[in-house]
């Protein structure tokens, strides 16, 4: 289960969502917590909240460099969410990071970061840039096992 503190939570509801996360009693082995992007106040607040829980797998939204993981406690496993051109370009470096246990990609945010308005063609298929990103992230993850 993914508990989302990023896009699924309105800005005015972030504090309440963090409080609910602290109070939740879900199985930590079955929960991933998606946090706000590095470089935001939300990222720091989300990590502080996580340290008050038993949840230990964090999905880092809009990850762009491995340096952004330096403030993540070594007790946490990381899933790097590649949602920008820079993030996709660093997929191999993410996969090699000692705390990273998985990679994901996000088509809509990727296309928006490039100035586009939609990741899919009129027929519903992904545009080439999204298909490339998906393949690159998959290959980076597969190469690391």
Predicted regions and their residues:
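Expand to "…catalyze enediolate/carbanion chemistry for C-C bond making/breaking, isomerization
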Residues: 1-145
């Amino acid at each position: 289960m993914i508990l989302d503190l990023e896009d699924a939570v309105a800005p005015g509801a972030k504090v309440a969502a963090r409080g609910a996360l602290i109070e939740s009693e879900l199985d930590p082995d079955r929960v991933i917590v998606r946090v706000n992007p590095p470089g935001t106040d939300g990222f720091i607040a989300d990590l502080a909240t996580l340290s008050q829980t038993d949840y230990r797998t964090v999905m880092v939204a809009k990850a762009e460099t491995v340096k952004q993981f330096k403030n993540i406690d070594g007790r946490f496993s990381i899933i790097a969410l590649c949602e920008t051109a820079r993030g996709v370009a660093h997929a191999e470096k993410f996969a090699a990071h000692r705390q990273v246990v998985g990679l994901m990609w996000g088509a809509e945010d990727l296309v928006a970061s490039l100035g586009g308005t939609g990741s899919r063609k009129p027929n519903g298929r992904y545009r080439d840039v999204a298909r490339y990103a998906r393949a690159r992230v998959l290959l980076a993850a597969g190469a690391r096992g």
